[in-house]
UniProtKB/Swiss-Prot annotation:
This is Tensin-3. The gene is TNS3. One of its GO terms (biological process) is positive regulation of Rac protein signal transduction. Pfam families: PTB, PTEN_C2, SH2. It is an enzyme of class 3 (hydrolase). It comes from Homo sapiens (Human). SUPFAM superfamilies: (Phosphotyrosine protein) phosphatases II (SSF52799), C2 domain (Calcium/lipid-binding domain, CaLB) (SSF49562), PH domain-like (SSF50729), SH2 domain (SSF55550). PROSITE patterns: C2_TENSIN, PPASE_TENSIN, SH2. One of its GO terms (molecular function) is phosphoprotein phosphatase activity. The lineage of its organism: Eukaryota, Metazoa, Chordata, Craniata, Vertebrata. It is found in: Cell junction, Focal adhesion; Cell projection, Podosome. Residues 175-301 form the C2 tensin-type domain. Residues 1-170 form the Phosphatase tensin-type domain. Residues 358-421, 538-568, 618-695, 717-769, 859-981, 1076-1127 are annotated as: Disordered. Belongs to the PTEN phosphatase protein family.
Length: 1445
């Protein structure tokens, strides 16, 4: 059947319309017809039609039509299986939502794609067939048979048939990975004169190339069977395409022999055979023999199949593996040219392990627009090979050195599923078993876009679940020309270089890579800085500019995403390169509210949040800390050793960067050492002789200190006993560092993009022109055997400190992006990822987040080292022993203005002082805190938008942003010790935009006298006045509380402090005060901040030792806070002197008396916000809680009347006169003693509404803290509670608590959760039942099908509603049958259905039995509804309520 030559509009049914345009019609004709069709649709259907665009995305189409869904895929190809399901679900949802709705299927090109959609939807609706739809199905079948069936490709029909089988249940999804060993062609195609054929094969997974074979030369005298050996075996999973080409002998062209697509889920057994009629292209090609067929041979392992020798070719078949012909490299479907072929630059096929990219002169011509136009001169000789990017990823190929710039190729369109589509698809496919069970596969592509002039590099990864320690493979990219044995540079970190797999005799140095699901390097830590001959870097704005690109990893996605930075040849010393990792917390939305023009907030196509930060381009100075370099494993070691190795914080020699016109260089850092002696010339400070020994001593010292206060504390294992198997001891087990996030870019610097990664303990900054690659939500949770204990917590949460009050950004060259990292313990924090939680919204309130549960959406899990105490869910972080920090209400950000003076020869040191006013200790809660981090503890600020945790040695670190320079050019300062427990100061120049943090186990021993040498100030030339303090001691805390940021608001980062836990161990945090003299400030130069990380609990001990001097200057008028909603810092009109909060420790030995010297006072404070912030209680509940308390008692809650505001309810001594005049009854007067005030959130901060004399505060904690000191506009001072008022009510008045619980239960609560499984427990109950049920579920084969259910708790019991009716419709468990509810005591996470989620369950009586129990398991689904909130509600409100129904 031939396709038509004009517009074809067909009403398939009354509500399904197909509109197709021939591929050859002109643009004018297409646009004219499109406008006509649009007018007809609008006149007939109004805005009630949805356009499903099966072709490339077009602006015209989007502009003309109100609702359009771009779901296109390449013509003549089968769509991905998940896309088919997405289209069907979207179509059904749209048609069912309104009887007036119609669907318009638009396609430009072959109608085969329309046939795919119509036949798929026909099968989709047939599952839930009804009589009234029978006519529609008949109409669709008739259209399919008459119009489009003959136009469909065999692969398209194969996919439709597979989907039909899945929907009907006749086909069971094969979820196990398959390793392809052989592709056998039965029958030699006759593509050249004399029966000669020169086939070569390409394998694609998710339309990305993963393997390219050599060229097989088959003559007419050879047998009619060609066996293409895939060596090493290629792991395939999901949508697979095999494409076979014939390379013409005397011309630079190739012909497609056949193409076939299939889904591995449909493969039953280990063999597939496709006849000629099943092959795309070949089915209608006379050159392919009629008896010909293609056979694929799989196995379950990558090992060579025993007894397969007979399959190999005889000696007459010659295989050419070593070719640099660019013809072989055209393979990426990422950017399609007009004829559907893919253009590709030359790349390796000889199996080289490392791939490299060389820049070429921009004046040289690139590869022309099509396969026919490749000049022979583009195949250089083989004498001088440079490793280039191989899009096949299975094979990196040696190609010749050309020294040319990137070629620009024809434009193409590419679209991934939107975040919402993916979320819906996850739900839809979860029943089919299509969800990716933790493993993700990304392939390397090297394609160019005409409009961006860039190179897309997406390295291949293959991850294997379970114990596939020797089976998985990964190829990444290096750009250094170095011997294979020279793997001591950071570049080696970019590739997991293991040679434990078999080598092919033809593949040279290519080896089988070993990887695992949590392979950190597989997340893309492999790009390196290079040189830019033009000396100019232009970022990628999607415009017509050349520049560095980024790459991102997507979670569970099979579609290519954004590219990564180009890999270029570095200058002289390639041994030290920087790696970068970015991080994003859900609290970023707080800061985004007040982002100034310097920041933009957007979402990536797959729902990943993106920060775009601009910084001045005219700031030439740049000093940055570079990561230390560990010894990377040699070729004979496992790549997991590389994954588990840490990179310390080390200097970057100046000669690694090309001097730019602006003379940007990198001075050395006096406080940094090189770990493992990665270069003696790099070591500028004393290196510890035995870092492992130092770490162990520090850990044990901390253990002893904590045991003094808490005998139940379980000592943290030391490096020796926990990591005895680790190859080198360059990293502490508590290294959970992140990387760094944002830095300034100078457009005229001469260096390429680079990475800076705090990998298990590195402090790193991104150099000039650098740009962080995007990291996605990929899972890296390693199941493989032999895993070292701390590898799962190897990456802490990284973050970004932005100082966005910048000058107007001059050009697009100043934009850089920071993306979210993927890490299973942190994945709950990504707002844009879990979108489907709102699909089934109910009017029932959400579960109140009780004091045990936080009020933000982030989540951090126990790393393997954390003590096994009962876990409490926390979206922010889990402190030792299950303590959880609070979020918004107790967070407080501080700003310390930097004076315009260099740091003196003696750098600032911290000292601790335990004396403080109790009320202020409690009120200040989590404001300014520095505390210690025991090994293995991962810290995260619960409402911190971005923050970096970097670990290099057990020394505390504070980051300051100075203001002795133009606003918006922050000065980062870090306290990093040259030796253990000797905190010293080193600084970054103003062009750096980050403030790195080190989370540390902090030994409380006396710090030695050693200070940073005077050279530490060599690069600080901001002034000459000494740093000192002109403030009295009592102003120190007030200065932090009242520091305004000058003219423009600066988003700064709230902190989280630890609170009291169930075991009664109070968690204390350091409160660091950095006073100083502010004489050098001008109003326009203030506005920088200090961010101090919240840390795990420490014993309350004094450190009476050497006095410390402060860095920076603070005055009460130059301080600020971060608003929970605005995220910006604001000016607070405080009195010059605040009450005396603290006294300096008398035991401290003062420094020499000098006008600017002052002691730094460090205070312990306790988090109390969880006592007074009750987000979800009602006004009546607040009155009930407070009416019997003493005056000054208060509660802060979320306002129900004013969205986004807070309500302050406080008890007063006497009611207002207006109330007394009403002669109310005594009972009513008691209620009137509780007065209510509205706390409004404004761009300036939070304040009491309607009170003119009330200042603005940066957070609720700050507001509460100040009003506990002076009442201001309130009737009296606030009394900071020392315990939870809910607990007091429960103890003092059980009946009151019961009534409150009954009210909550009557109202009910509900949210969406993942339903995992129901396991019969006989008579077992309690935590053991939850633990056993989850253990059974995790090993169950096949794994149980999970689905999203609506979980409602009411006075009648628990009701589950399956949103998609996949497993059941509705289940109800009466309240008297529910026995127990709790989180998993082992704190295991559910990662199958997306981000890592906590698991909880409840035990209920089995229906009809008085003794048998059933445990029902669930996992978190909605980030705003943590599992602990649900468990608390069920346990304390429903089960704990005496009024059972």
């Amino acid at each position: 059947m031939e396709e038509g030559h004009g517009l074809d509009l067909t009403y398939i049914t009354e509500r399904i319309i197909a509109v197709s345009f021939p591929a050859g019609c002109s643009e004018e004709s297409y646009l004219h017809n499109l406008q006509e069709v649009t007018r007809m649709l609008k006149s007939k259907h109004g805005d009630n039609y949805l356009v499903l665009n099966l072709s490339e995305k077009r602006y015209d189409l989007t502009k003309l039509n109100p609702k359009i869904m771009d779901v296109g895929w390449p013509e003549l190809h089968a769509p991905p299986l998940d896309k088919m399901c997405t289209i069907c679900k979207a179509q059904e949802s749209w048609l069912n939502s309104n009887l007036q709705h119609v669907v318009v299927i638009h396609c430009r090109g072959g109608k085969g794609r329309i046939g795919v959609v119509i036949s798929s939807y026909m099968h989709f609706t047939n599952v839930s067939a009804s009589a009234d739809q029978a006519l529609d199905r008949f109409a669709m079948k008739k259209f399919y048979d008459d119009k489009v069936s003959a136009l469909m490709q065999p692969s398209q029909k194969r996919y439709v048939q597979f989907l039909s089988g899945l929907l009907s249940g006749s086909v069971k999804m094969n979820a196990s990975p398959l390793f392809l060993h052989f592709v056998i062609l039965h029958g030699t195609p006759n593509f050249d004169t004399g029966g000669v054929c020169r086939p070569f094969l390409k394998l694609y997974q998710a339309m990305q190339p993963v393997y390219t074979s050599g060229i097989y030369n088959v003559g007419p005298e050879n047998p009619s069977r060609i066996c293409i050996v895939i060596e090493p075996a290629q792991l395939l999973k999901g949508d697979v395409m095999v494409k076979c080409y014939h390379k013409k002998y005397r011309s630079a062209t190739r012909d497609v022999i056949f193409r076939l697509q299939f889904h591995t889920g449909a493969v039953q057994g280990y063999g597939l055979v496709f006849g000629k009629e099943d092959l795309d292209n070949a089915s209608k090609d006379d050159r392919f023999p009629d008896y010909g067929k293609v056979e694929l041979v799989f196995s379950a392992t990558p090992e060579k199949i025993q007894g397969s020798e007979h399959l190999y070719n005889d000696h007459g078949v010659i295989v050419d593996y070593n070719t640099t012909d660019p013809l072989i490299r055209w393979d990426s479907y990422e950017n399609l040219s007009a004829d559907g072929e893919v253009l590709h630059t030359q790349g390796p096929v000889d199996g080289s392990l490392y791939a490299k990219v060389r820049k070429k002169s921009s004046s040289d011509p690139g590869i022309p627009g099509g396969p026919q136009a490749i000049p022979a001169t583009n195949s250089p000789d083989h004498s001088d090979h440079t490793l280039s990017v191989s899009s096949d990823s299975g094979h990196s190929t040696a190609s010749a050195r050309t020294d040319k710039t990137e070629e620009r190729l024809a434009p193409g369109t590419r679209r991934g599923l939107s975040a919402q589509e993916k979320a819906e698809l996850d739900q839809l496919l979860s029943g089919f078993g299509l969800e990716d069970p933790g493993s993700s596969l990304k392939e390397m592509t090297d394609a160019r876009s005409k409009y961006s002039g860039t190179r897309h590099v997406v390295p291949a990864q293959v991850h294997v679940n379970g114990d596939a320690a020797l089976k998985d493979r990964e190829t990444d990219i290096l750009d250094d020309e170095m011997p294979h044995h020279d793997l001591h540079s950071v570049d080696s970190l970019g590739t997991l270089s293991s040679s434990e797999g078999p080598q092919s005799a033809h593949l040279g140095p290519f080896t089988c890579h070993k990887s695992s699901q949590n392979s950190l390097l597989s997340d893309g830590f492999g790009s390196n800085v290079g040189e830019d001959p033009q000396g100019t870097l232009v970022p990628d704005l999607g415009l017509g500019m050349d520049g560095p690109y980024e790459r991102e990893r997507t979670f569970g996605s099979r579609e290519p995403k954004q590219p990564q930075p180009l890999l270029r040849k570095p200058s002289v010393s390639a041994q030290m390169q920087a790696y970068g990792q970015s991080s994003y917390s859900t609290q970023t939305w707080v800061r985004q509210q007040q982002m100034v023009v310097a920041h933009q907030y957007s979402f990536a196509p797959d729902g990943e949040a993106r920060l775009v930060s601009r910084c001045p381009a005219d700031n030439p100075g740049l000093v940055q800390a570079q990561p230390r370099v560990p010894l990377t494993p040699t070729r004979g070691t496992s790549s997991r050793v590389a994954v588990q190795r840490g990179v310390g914080s080390g200097p970057h020699p100046p000669d690694t960067q090309q001097p730019s016109p602006s003379k940007a260089f990198k001075p050395r850092f006096p406080g940094d050492q090189v770990v493992n002696g990665a270069g003696p010339e790099l070591s500028t400070g004393p290196s510890p002789g035995s870092p492992t020994l130092d770490i162990d001593q520090s850990i044990e010292q901390l253990n002893r200190l904590i045991l003094e206060l808490d005998p139940t504390f379980e000592p943290i294992p030391t490096h020796m006993n926990a990591l005895g198997s680790q190859a080198n001891g360059s990293v502490s087990p508590d290294s959970v560092g992140g990387g760094l996030r944002a830095s300034s870019r100078l457009p005229d610097t001469g260096e390429g993009p680079s990475r800076a990664t705090g990998r298990q303990g590195s402090s790193a900054e991104q150099p000039l022109g650098g740009r962080l690659r995007k990291l996605s939500l990929g899972q890296y949770d390693n199941d493989a055997g032999g895993q070292l204990p701390f590898s799962k917590c190897a990456w802490g949460k990284a973050g970004v400190d932005y100082a966005p009050n910048l000058p107007p950004f001059p050009s697009p060259a100043d934009v850089k992006e920071t993306m979210t990292p993927g890490y299973p313990q942190d994945l709950d924090i990504i707002d844009g990822r879990i979108l489907s939680s709102k699909e089934s919204m109910c009017s029932t309130p959400a579960f109140p987040v009780s004091p045990e549960t936080p009020y933000v959406k982030t989540a951090l899990r126990h790393p393997p080292f954390s003590p096994p105490e009962p876990p409490l869910s926390s979206p922010a972080s889990q402190h030792k022993g299950g303590r959880e920090p609070r979020s918004c209400p107790e967070t407080l950000t501080h700003a310390v203005g930097m004076s315009e003076s260099p740091i003196g020869p003696k750098s600032t040191m911290l000292r601790a002082d335990a004396s403080s006013t109790p009320s202020f200790q409690q009120a200040f809660a989590s404001s300014c805190t520095i505390s210690s981090n025991g090994p293995g503890q991962r810290r995260e600020s619960s409402s911190s938008a971005e923050r970096q945790w970097v670990e290099s040695s057990p020394k505390p670190m504070v980051s300051l942003l100075g203001s002795g320079r133009p606003t918006g050019s922050p000065l980062s300062a870090e306290f990093s010790g040259t030796r253990k427990d000797s905190p010293v100061l080193s600084c970054f120049p103003p062009s750096e935009l980050q403030a790195p943090f080190h989370s540390h186990e902090l030994s409380l021993a006396e710090p030695p006298d050693s200070l940073a040498p005077p050279s530490s100030q060599a690069f600080l030339g901001f002034g000459t006045a000494p740093v000192g303090s002109g403030l009295p001691p009592e102003e120190d805390l007030g200065a932090l509380l009242a520091n305004s940021h000058g003219a423009s608001p600066t988003p700064s980062i709230p902190l989280t402090a630890t609170g009291a836990a169930d075991n009664g161990f109070l968690s204390h945090n350091f409160l660091t005060v950095a006073p100083g003299h502010s004489s050098h400030h001008s109003p326009g130069l203030q506005g920088q901040g200090v961010t101090l990380p919240g840390q795990p609990p420490l014993p309350e001990k004094k450190r009476a030792s050497e006095g410390d001097r402060s860095l920076g200057s603070v005055s009460p008028s130059s301080s600020g806070f971060s608003s929970p909603h605005s995220g910006s810092t604001i000016s607070i009109p405080f009195p010059n002197v605040l009450p005396d909060f603290s006294k300096a420790s008398e035991a401290a030995s003062p420094l020499p008396d000098s006008p600017g010297d002052k002691l730094v006072i460090v205070k312990f404070v306790q988090d109390t916000s969880k006592f007074w912030y009750k987000a979800d209680i009602s006004r009546e509940q607040a009155i009930a809680m407070l009416k019997d308390k003493e005056p000054g008692s208060f509660i802060v809650r979320d306002s129900h009347s004013f969205r986004g505001a807070y309500g302050l309810a406080m008890k007063v001594a006497t009611p207002p006169p207006s109330v007394l005049q009403l002669n109310k009854k005594a009972g009513d007067l008691a209620n009137e003693l509780v007065r209510h005030f509205l706390i409004e959130c404004t761009p300036k901060g939070v304040r009491l509404k309607g009170c003119s004399n009330e200042p603005y505060f940066g957070s609720l904690t700050a507001l509460v803290c100040q009003h506990s000191i002076t009442p201001l506009a309130l009737p009296c001072k606030l009394l900071i509670p020392e315990r939870d008022p809910l607990e007091e009510i429960a103890e003092s008045s059980p009946q009151t608590a019961a009534n409150s619980a009954a009210e909550l239960l009557k109202q009910g609560a509900a949210c969406n959760v993942w339903y995992l499984n129901s396991v019969e427990m006989e008579s077992l109950t309690g935590h053991q039942a939850i633990q056993k049920a989850l253990s059974i579920t995790l090993v169950q084969e096949p794994p149980p099908v999970s689905t999203v259910v609506h979980f409602k708790v009411s006075a009648q019991g628990i009701t589950l509603t399956d949103n998609q009716r996949k497993l059941f419709f509705r289940r109800h468990y009466p309240v008297n049958s529910v026995i127990f509810c709790a989180l998993d005591p082992q704190d295991r996470k559910w990662i199958k259905d997306g981000p890592s989620s906590k698991v909880f369950g409840f035990v209920a009586r089995k229906q009809g039995s008085a003794t048998d129990n059933v445990c029902h398991l669930f996992a978190e689904h909605d980030p705003e509804q943590p599992a602990s909130a649900i468990v608390n509600f069920v346990s304390k409100v429903m089960i704990g309520s005496p009024k059972k129904v």
